[in-house]
Design a protein with these regions (language model features):
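Anion (oxyanion) recognition and catalysis
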Residues: 25, 50, 95, 130, ...
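Hydrophobic residues in well-ordered beta-strands that form the structural core
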Residues: 56-58, 142, 177, 239
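Active-site acidic/histidine proton-transfer and metal-coordination neighborhood
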Residues: 73-174
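Histidine-acidic metal/acid-base catalytic patches
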Residues: 1-28, 38, 89-92, 98-100, ...
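Active-site loop signature of alpha/beta-hydrolase-fold enzymes
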Residues: 64, 147, 182
Length: 260
């Protein structure tokens, strides 16, 4: 059975952020992930991790103004210096928190910029980040996201992600494969994860439709969990879903699959 990490941006939101670490540990999780750590000091978060015996699995590079609808800046030609500063900030946090991977959100395709320039910017930024992170012993992952939830999101399918990875040409760049997003965009989940096991360093989950916990929608998670074991996936699976009711009430799927 895969190792599951609680996504604290979406789970245990009944409590303040720093209280969610203890809640996750009490629920049986051994790892955590979330969108961003930057509203808190790395020392504050590290103390919560240590107090609750949790592994910091992943967080994202700074992604612009989230409250204003930005969803990454890596493909934006006029934000390169901001992106590079964000890489340095992420490294500083990861070196304290102990995670060995960070995720890059491409962002929403900018209006009035030609496709070639957008792609060139994204590739160059990924190359810069992959090299800087590699020097710090940290892997870079990038996530394809469906364009129904985030219209215009630049990186939105596996084939595109693999093409971008080839252009970057770094052995330190991997895929974060989000089962929910890719079910919407392309399906064929098991075959894709099998074919690209070597390029996938992190997986996230939610059911579809609704982005709720496994067992509430169309995805056969029992099969997929067993499939990940069969193909030898060694990474974490981040639980990035919206509980249908409360977090605690929606954790039955973990017990059903003997995951906690």
């Amino acid at each position: 059975m895969p190792r599951f990490a609680a996504n604290l941006s979406m789970l245990f939101t009944e409590q303040d952020f720093l209280a969610r670490f203890e809640a996750a540990a009490k629920a049986g999780f051994s790892g955590v992930e979330y969108l961003f750590p930057y509203d808190f000091s790395s020392a504050e978060i590290k103390a919560k991790l240590d107090a609750n015996g949790l592994t910091q699995v992943l967080f994202n590079l700074p992604a612009g103004d989230w409250a204003k609808g930005e969803r990454g800046i890596a493909c934006l030609p006029d934000r390169v210096e901001e992106f590079r500063a964000g890489v340095d900030l992420a490294i500083a946090y990861a070196q304290v928190l102990g995670n060995t991977q960070v995720n890059c959100l491409a962002g929403i395709r900018p209006q009035g910029v030609d496709d070639a320039t957008v792609e060139k910017t994204f590739v160059a930024n990924l190359k810069y980040a992959a090299d800087k992170l590699q020097a710090a012993g940290i892997k870079l992952v990038m996530e394809a996201i469906n364009t129904r939830d985030i219209p215009g999101f630049y990186l939105n399918n596996t084939a595109q992600a693999l093409s971008i990875r080839e252009q970057v040409g770094s052995a330190n760049l991997f895929l974060q494969y989000d089962i929910y997003h890719m079910q919407i965009m392309e399906g064929d989940l098991a075959r894709t994860m099998t074919a690209h096991l070597g390029e996938i360093n992190h997986i996230q989950l939610a059911d579809n439709p609704g982005r709720n916990e496994p067992g509430t929608g169309e995805i056969n998670y029992r099969f997929l969990f067993e499939h990940l074991d069969r193909i030898g996936y060694q990474g974490w699976v981040g639980c990035e879903y919206k509980p249908l009711t409360t977090t605690e009430a929606g954790l039955g799927w973990l017990k059903t699959h003997n995951a906690i």
